[in-house]
Design a protein with these regions (language model features):
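Sec-dependent bacterial lipoprotein signal peptides
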Residues: 1-16
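Cysteine-centric segments in proteins
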Residues: 17-114
Length: 114
């Protein structure tokens, strides 16, 4: 009985502890040249943009973790991220990932991991 009485305050305090919610991962950025394009993946959307075109936005799907990177598949945008050094061919910048994107059936290649 004494043990139960001693444990009740500890249990009551534990019930008041805030629930930990993990922060959202930072957005993922990728870019390409010839033609120029940008990709942003955040917790809500996968957004593909090109100059002089309307952005194509799809809800962010559950990520598929492959042996070499990540895959995101939506009805209009498919993204394959391969971890490995990448150069965009127009600057001296080196990126963390090689990125292949298929948007409405068109293939785009670039670099990501900004």
């Amino acid at each position: 009985m004494k043990i139960t009485v001693l444990l009740l305050p500890a249990l009551a305090l534990g019930a008041c502890a805030p629930v930990y919610v993990a922060p959202a991962p930072p957005p993922y950025h990728a870019v390409g040249t010839e033609p120029f394009w940008n990709l942003l993946i955040d917790e809500h959307d996968v957004t593909f943009t090109q100059p002089d075109a309307q952005p194509i936005r799809q809800p962010t799907p559950k990520v598929i973790h492959g042996f070499a990177g990540e895959i995101y598949n939506t009805p209009r945008i498919n993204v394959n991220i391969v971890h490995g050094s990448c150069s965009d061919g127009m600057s001296d910048r080196t990126y963390l990932d090689k990125v292949q994107i298929r948007v409405d059936g068109r293939q785009f290649n670039g670099c990501g991991g900004l």
